[in-house]
Structure formats: structure tokens, C-alpha cells
Amino acid sequence: MTNSSPVPRLLVVEDEYLIRMLLEDMLDDLGYGIAAAVGTLSEARQIATDGNFSAAILDVNLDGQEIYPVADILAKRGLPFVFVTGYGERSLPEPYRGRPALQKPFQAEQLKTTLAGLLS
């Protein structure tokens, strides 16, 4: 990222606190801003509907609840997002299989490459 362009701000949705903190640190190291970092489906829905951010990182399973209603909101708003899952892209329902997905655990370089493609 160049200094002349605004820093993309991201919505991070991850229910596991330590993973959410690690993800925030990775994003900071990669030069991204955090618009919000939340761990529940209700918080994610609210921010997805009203929030001001460039893209989102969505954990597929939030304490037993699936993230897909939030993904639908983002898609309707035209905002890019990437799924994060411990089960791989093939575990995503058919309508979401073409979307970017990172399989846990992933490295910062994988996140960097995925976000660069998402925001280009």
C-alpha cells in the first residue's frame, strides 16, 4: 500500500477472542485499519448493515451460528469479503463457493495475497 492512498479499513468477524486479536495484529502489520472487530452474529449484522469499511473477514462459524446472513448483507451492499473456515472452501454452501476463502490456520502472506486480490 502506498502512503498516498487511504488505508483500507476492515470489518473482522471472529468469535474466538485470541484468534481475533491475532488477526487484528496481522492486519495492522500488513498496513490495514480495523473498522470493527466483533465476535457475535448480531454485532456483525449491525455493522454489516450500517458500518463504514472497505471489506470484511468473516469466520464462517460463530459459536454454532453461520455467518451467511452477514455475507448476504455485504453482497447486497457491494462490499467484498473473505470467508475464514477451519473446514475448507468445499464446506461452503454452493452459493458461496466462488467467494474467496482462507482455511484456518493460515499465514500472514496468504492473508496479504487474498486481501490484495479482494481490494484490487
Which residue ranges define each predicted feature?
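Non-catalytic signal-transmission and effector/linker regions of two-component phosphorelay proteins
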Residues: 1-9, 42, 107-120
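Conserved acidic carboxylate
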Residues: 14
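Two-component/phosphorelay signaling modules centered on CheY-like receiver
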Residues: 17-36
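Acidic, metal-coordinating helix/loop segments flanking the phosphotransfer/catalytic sites
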Residues: 37-55
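Active-site residues of response regulator receiver
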Residues: 59
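Acidic catalytic/metal-coordinating carboxylates
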Residues: 66-69
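A Lys-centered signature of the CheY-like receiver
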Residues: 104
